[in-house]
Amino acid sequence: MTSPSPHRFHRHPAAPWAELRDSARSPHCFRLHMHAEYSIGIVDAGRTVFHHAHGPQPVEAGGVVLIEPGAWHACNPDPGAPWSYRMLFVDADWLHARLGVAALRFPRRTLTDADIASLVDGLCRPVDGTAAADRLALGLEHLLDRCAQPAALPLPGDAAALAPALQRLHAGPDAGLTVQSLAQECGMSATRFIRRFKAATGMTPGSYRLNLRINGARRLLATGAALSEAAYAMGFADQAHLQRAFKAHHALTPGCYARGA
């Protein structure tokens, strides 16, 4: 008999710009990955090691994690020691429009302040209607006023020289792009392009593109698309290919994600 998933996902039509992940006593580990959304999380029990550009950092129960879109990271528990956490994903375009900014950055990606933890705890709860969605939006403004700063560009790192390749990748991650073609877009050799790309984003071009495709499939699944449709739309060879990649990056199958379990 299959064990129930420790992961739950909460989405509501009143807040289409937000999604909540609630993971209880999860032993699962993640590969380095990134999200298209802002990620705001709190550890409820246990501890995790937060791998990111300025890490790794241990985060204990009550600790808060803040992650910008496109920032590579992974949060993994100690071996044999499950942890519980909640993570709120907020659509970047919606948030930028609401706050009137091009992008946001978090000067500190981990916080242990009790007031901040209490605020994030209140934000990381399921939305059940319009009133709750309005409270969530106002709470986000309050949190970001304290913890975020406006940024000029939403591109990760010193990526100006890589902008042509990044634009191509984001415009069509499902297309048959090669390292050579992306390097030519930036006027670089393939070797130099890979080195510069990894220094700016924390990932190889191939890993970055795979993340974009997985995130694209995730968005489609959240709107009710069939697994086969999401796999085809994002350029995966078949459903099994998407399932393997999705589970490695999100610690659950795309089917479980679509069902919210």
Regions found by a protein language model. Name each.
Residues 3-104:
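N-terminal regulatory/effector-sensing and dimerization cores
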Residues 4-8, 29-31, 104-107, 130, ...:
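Jelly-roll (double-stranded beta-helix
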Residues 102-117, 121-186, 199-211:
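Short, Lys/Arg-enriched, Trp-marked, Pro/Gly-tolerant hinge/linker segments that flank
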Residues 170, 175-212, 231-260:
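Basic/polar phosphate-binding segments, predominantly the helix-turn-helix DNA-binding elements
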Residues 175, 223-225:
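Flexible coil/turn residues that form the inter-helical turn or adjacent wing/linker of helix-turn-helix
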Residues 218:
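Short, amphipathic alpha-helical "recognition" segments used to contact nucleic acids or chromatin
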